[in-house]
């Protein structure tokens, strides 16, 4: 067991009940273009086209052969683009159940399927995009390979679902997915989990590793740091546990599996719980009549690193297993910094709230202050458990010094790894955004 001592479990109200419920009927789904780092689409459909489930919607010009497929059958009703014609979303009105099917196999055959057959089926179905590389967090090139694949079978994000609840419901498909992953690498498949018991693969290159401790103990960046540190040469792939289930279902049934169990939670959710829905589901429909009155912000993903779901991107993200909802923090407290703050959370113990152990806080979107200088008072070291110098790294990200940032370990990180640093930062810096700009420059300059 690897125990993490530094980190932070956010004491936020609205913890979900760990019982899976059926969600609302979804009539619109979407693929979100901006989720895929560096992707430039070649469109295969236009508004008005009828599509089947698993039919190709677009390909990636920069990553030849990688296909992005429809999560449902129906009609393309929107192709939304933003500044500089960047693809925001392809929206489909769900109708019918027509789908493209693929080869199916017996569970005993999966580990003996040759690698090229596995790759071809994953690419044609669109499930290849469930894999992401580290560094850079991009969909891997089809002809690439890796010595390490990480399966994230735990989740320490605030308000997250417990993976064992979902995995044990789909144990056969989960094991089948692990068998499929074992064929994609000559190296190891690392299944990273908490202390709970999970279904196990019998393949010799599939290993289980137990992590314990506060967030970010459940992030793949933390797992890689301790088990297989990545750099420009050592490239690892990662996948979440629900996509492992989708891999297994694809090869067992020959059908694209797009079901998702997400946590619908937060301080303004009426009944926080686990909800069964599908990839790309409209979050306006999913949260209809589920929220308390008032101005709220719906987030696809975690409250720490998720994306505001509004307008053309108001849909469940490809890699997100949560829908979090917070009240918009428009109100200002007169001399709030001088008040005792019984109902306020503070990492630096500035308010009385830290004295009430176990108290959950109705957090909002407010930053509790304006932008200011970066102040190194030890906050970053408290929440980043990786063996690196966070203050120096974050300073280099702010200054745009990519050479120094790379030496300090920037290639190991993704936006979610620095989300807690953003949360505890007195200067209100968005370190995830600064990291992405740094990684883009490093990749561009080779």
From Swiss-Prot:
GO terms for biological process: sodium ion transport. The keyword Repeat does not apply. InterPro entries: NqrA, NQRA_2nd, NqrA_C_domain, NQRA_N. Keywords: Ion transport, NAD, Sodium, Sodium transport, Translocase, Transport, Ubiquinone. Its EC number is 7.2.1.1. It is an enzyme of class 7 (translocase). The keyword Flavoprotein does not apply. It catalyses: a ubiquinone + n Na(+)(in) + NADH + H(+) = a ubiquinol + n Na(+)(out) + NAD(+). One of its GO terms (molecular function) is oxidoreductase activity, acting on NAD(P)H, quinone or similar compound as acceptor. Pfam families: NQRA_2nd, NQRA_N, NQRA_SLBB. Belongs to the NqrA family. Composed of six subunits; NqrA, NqrB, NqrC, NqrD, NqrE and NqrF. NQR complex catalyzes the reduction of ubiquinone-1 to ubiquinol by two successive reactions, coupled with the transport of Na(+) ions from the cytoplasm to the periplasm. NqrA to NqrE are probably involved in the second step, the conversion of ubisemiquinone to ubiquinol. HAMAP family: NqrA. This is Na(+)-translocating NADH-quinone reductase subunit A. It comes from Vibrio anguillarum. The lineage of its organism: Bacteria, Pseudomonadati, Pseudomonadota, Gammaproteobacteria, Vibrionales. The gene is nqrA.
């Amino acid at each position: 067991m690897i125990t993490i001592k530094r980190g932070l479990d956010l004491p936020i109200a609205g913890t979900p009940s760990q019982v899976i419920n059926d969600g609302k009927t979804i009539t619109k789904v979407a693929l979100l273009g901006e989720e895929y780092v560096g992707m430039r689409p070649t469109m295969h459909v236009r508004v008005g086209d009828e599509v089947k489930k698993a039919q190709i919607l677009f390909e990636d010009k920069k990553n030849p052969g990688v296909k992005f497929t429809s999560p449902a059958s129906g009609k393309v009703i929107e192709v939304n683009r933003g500044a500089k014609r960047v693809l925001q979303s392809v929206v489909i009105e769900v109708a019918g159940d027509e789908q493209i099917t693929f080869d199916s196999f017996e569970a005993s055959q999966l580990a003996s399927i040759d690698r090229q057959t596995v790759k071809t089926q994953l690419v044609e179905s669109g499930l290849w995009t469930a894999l992401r590389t580290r560094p850079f967090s991009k969909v891997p090139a089809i002809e690439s390979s890796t010595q390490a694949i990480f399966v994230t079978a735990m989740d320490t994000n605030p308000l997250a679902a417990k993976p064992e609840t979902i995995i044990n419901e789909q144990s056969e498909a989960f094991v089948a997915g692990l068998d499929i992953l074992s064929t994609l690498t000559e190296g190891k498949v690392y299944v990273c989990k908490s202390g709970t018991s999970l279904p196990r693969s019998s393949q010799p290159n599939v290993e289980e590793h137990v992590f314990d401790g506060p967030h970010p103990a459940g992030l793949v960046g933390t797992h890689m740091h301790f088990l297989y540190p990545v750099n420009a040469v050592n490239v690892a792939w990662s996948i979440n546990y629900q996509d492992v289930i989708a891999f297994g279902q694809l090869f067992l049934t020959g059908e694209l599996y797009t079901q998702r169990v997400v946590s619908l939670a937060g301080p303004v959710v009426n009944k926080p719980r686990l909800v069964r829905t599908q990839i790309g589901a409209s979050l306006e429909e999913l949260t209809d009549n589920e929220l308390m009155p008032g101005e709220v912000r719906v987030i696809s993903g975690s409250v720490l690193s998720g994306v505001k779901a509004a307008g053309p991107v108001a849909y469940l993200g490809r890699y997100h297993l949560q829908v979090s909802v917070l009240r918009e923090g428009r109100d200002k407290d007169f001399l709030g910094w001088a008040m005792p703050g019984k109902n306020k959370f503070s990492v630096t113990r500035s308010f009385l709230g830290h004295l009430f152990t176990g108290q959950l806080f109705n957090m909002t979107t407010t930053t509790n202050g304006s932008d200011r200088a970066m102040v190194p008072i030890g906050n970053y070291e408290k929440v980043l458990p990786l063996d690196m110098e966070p203050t120096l790294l974050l300073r280099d990200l702010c200054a745009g010094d990519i050479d120094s940032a790379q030496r300090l370990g920037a290639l190991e990180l993704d936006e979610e790894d620095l989300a807690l640093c953003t949360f505890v930062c007195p200067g209100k810096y968005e370190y995830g955004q600064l990291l992405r700009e740094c990684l883009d420059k490093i990749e561009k300059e080779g």
